[in-house]
């Protein structure tokens, strides 16, 4: 059995989701795990989860005779990679960084302030209308710089218009959650249509 399959079966068998497997120089085998997605529940990987998976993988990889010198099991962190449709569904509405396989081109940038050579974007991930029967996504952003603490903003100044770029998963080279650090605490994710009477 291939190493990828062995690791995936072991991780999912323990009740976790395999996010990424990486082999680096020096024989390091890095395995990234996460909690399976459950709508409405926000769960996080902790040290005990990583330890549990590490112990099981060490046993399984020894039995399989896998060639590695060090094993590292960790959570995906604040810049979690988005790899498949399920990941995009899970993190819709979140701030993401995407890199396209090819620049958007002159046709796509016509009539907008976006450069035709641009491949990298940061914005809010949203579901879009399907294109040719393929599930569509879009990223929405504003090129207005963020307001700095203590900075005064004129009430007369018009905000920069929102821009959107539609894409399919086949056009993505890399997508990750944007690492946003807020030391004032985690803000609850606003769900459209949620019952506002329960908020007090």
Swiss-Prot record:
<protein>
    <recommendedName>
        <fullName>Ribosome maturation factor RimP</fullName>
    </recommendedName>
</protein>
<dbReference type="Pfam" id="PF02576">
    <property type="entry name" value="RimP_N"/>
</dbReference>
<dbReference type="InterPro" id="IPR036847">
    <property type="entry name" value="RimP_C_sf"/>
</dbReference>
<keyword id="KW-0690">Ribosome biogenesis</keyword>
<dbReference type="InterPro" id="IPR028989">
    <property type="entry name" value="RimP_N"/>
</dbReference>
<comment type="function">
    <text>Required for maturation of 30S ribosomal subunits.</text>
</comment>
<dbReference type="GO" id="GO:0000028">
    <property type="term" value="P:ribosomal small subunit assembly"/>
</dbReference>
<dbReference type="GO" id="GO:0005829">
    <property type="term" value="C:cytosol"/>
</dbReference>
<keyword id="KW-0963">Cytoplasm</keyword>
<dbReference type="InterPro" id="IPR003728">
    <property type="entry name" value="Ribosome_maturation_RimP"/>
</dbReference>
<dbReference type="InterPro" id="IPR028998">
    <property type="entry name" value="RimP_C"/>
</dbReference>
<dbReference type="GO" id="GO:0006412">
    <property type="term" value="P:translation"/>
</dbReference>
<comment type="similarity">
    <text>Belongs to the RimP family.</text>
</comment>
<dbReference type="InterPro" id="IPR035956">
    <property type="entry name" value="RimP_N_sf"/>
</dbReference>
